[in-house]
């Protein structure tokens, strides 16, 4: 059963609002994103939603079933974002960006670069060298993926966003080819010497995203 979504309102500058929630059911948030986007007007403020998900595999519109190698009893949801299969679970920051891309004069590639840049900026604060990849969207540290990206564009507006691994059980990634890449390693901030709590990193990521979107 899809549960109603409750997000704590935290105002942001320049028509951008940031909202926080705890650990949420994926289907509930997905339906809420679609409803928000469908009801937007040209004056609707853009929003960033920061939360975590209960364990779930999400399969993008281009997702191939063979990238799910086995199913350890975790739900699989075929969603409407771009990309292949990935895993979400507690201990991972989910940042959903609900933006009017026409109003921001942003193309998809530009937005992807800004999202990657925000994560790179955050990790740079902790002297962790990270980078994006032109051919495989996301953020990587030493060849291991630490953040996955996926978007849905509808009527010039976007939803979905990024997932940053912080301090989670990485074992479910072993049951998939993450983002469709065989043998792709994954990592997380807690394995890179970053000891700040998830809530601290959430706030910092929000600031990095807002800064990148203003550039």
From Swiss-Prot:
The keyword Cytoplasm applies. One of its GO terms (cellular component) is cytoplasm. GO terms for molecular function: lipoyl(octanoyl) transferase activity. GO terms for biological process: protein modification process. The active site is at residue 179. Belongs to the LipB family. This is Octanoyltransferase. It comes from Nitrosospira multiformis (strain ATCC 25196 / NCIMB 11849 / C 71). The lineage of its organism: Bacteria, Pseudomonadati, Pseudomonadota, Betaproteobacteria, Nitrosomonadales. The gene is lipB.
């Amino acid at each position: 059963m899809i549960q109603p979504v409750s997000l704590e309102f935290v105002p942001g500058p320049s028509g951008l609002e940031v909202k926080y929630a705890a650990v949420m059911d994926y289907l509930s948030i997905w339906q809420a994103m679609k409803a928000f986007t469908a009801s937007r007007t040209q004056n609707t403020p853009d929003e960033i939603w920061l939360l975590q998900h209960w364990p779930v595999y999400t399969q993008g519109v281009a997702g191939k079933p063979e990238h799910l190698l086995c199913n350890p009893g975790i739900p699989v949801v075929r969603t409407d974002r771009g990309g292949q299969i990935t895993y979400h679970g507690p201990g991972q920051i989910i940042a959903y960006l609900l933006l009017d891309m026409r109003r921001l004069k942003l193309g998809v590639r530009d937005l992807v670069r800004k999202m990657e840049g925000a994560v790179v900026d955050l990790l740079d604060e902790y002297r962790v060298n990270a980078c994006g990849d032109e051919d495989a969207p996301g953020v990587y540290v030493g060849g291991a993926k630490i953040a996955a990206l996926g978007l849905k564009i509808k009527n010039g507006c976007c939803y979905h966003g990024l997932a940053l691994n912080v301090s989670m059980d990485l074992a479910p990634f072993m049951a998939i080819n993450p983002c469709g890449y065989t043998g792709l390693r994954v990592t997380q901030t807690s394995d890179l010497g970053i000891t700040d709590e998830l809530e601290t990193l959430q706030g910092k990521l929000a600031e990095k995203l807002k800064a990148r979107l203003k550039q």
